[in-house]
Amino acid sequence: DVRIVLPRKSNQRLADFARGAYLREMEDAGCKVLLWQPGMIHAKAGLIDDVAFVGSANFDVRSMLLNFEVDLFVYDVRSVATLESWFLDLLPDCKAGVPRASFIRRLAEGVFRLGAPVL
C-alpha cells in the first residue's frame, strides 16, 4: 500500500503546476495520491513498514545535492506509531486522485518538467 499526502494547493504555484504529470505517473504505477484540502501542509515525513523518516529534505535534486538537507530515520516503536496516527488523522480531509488534465495542461506540464529539477 503506497500513499502520498500532499496539499491540494501549496505556497508554490509553479511547483503545484509542475507536479501534475509526476503525480499522474505515480497513480498509474499504483500509488494512491491524496490531496489534503484544508490548506498548506509542509511536512516532509514518511512511513515505510515500521520505520519513519522526518526532516527538511524535499524529494528533489536541489535538496540532496545543493542545499544539503537531511532527514532523521526513526525506529522507536512509539514514535513511529505517533507519526502513523498523525498521517491517519489527515486522511478524512483528503481527496483521492489527481484531477484530469486537458491536452493543453499536459503539454504545459511537459514543458515544466524540463525545469522541474530546479524548482
List each model region and its residues.
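PLD/PLD-like phosphodiesterase catalytic module centered on the HKD motif
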Residues: 1-119
